[in-house]
């Protein structure tokens, strides 16, 4: 059994440092049904999936923001003082339909400030992009309080641009169509 007070304090401090408003809480996963529910919603095919399957945790940290994004926080096995933060598939979305869009979780330092910065820089842009693609495919209905600007925010999410550099804005034009050959000239016209 791990120290749940340390996990609760870490989750709370990370939530205060992430951009936007995140609600921290602890989830009781001591019953196998509760752990299975979290495991089925986990949007990570890497180390976090392994950690949930192979190691015992009776509590998990949970973070939820106003857009409906959810993250799970747990101590990293075999690495004292480190944690794992991974996204959950949005509520109402079938996990099997978005498996190919998996944004994967991150291993973070035990310092809440560094952990929040790692999640902000590496995890949240990947999560926003995966949600954007799922929304375009019609697999995810979008955030509950969509203000019309989420697509631009997701498309302009910065990962590690130098200060003062403007990010490139990418707008989706919808699904790509195959090129159509132009008869008699050996050229292919763009869609």
Summary of predicted features, one role per range:
Residues 95-154:
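Surface-exposed beta-loop interaction hotspot
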Residues 1-63, 132-185:
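Negatively charged, low-complexity tracts enriched in Asp/Glu with abundant Ser/Thr
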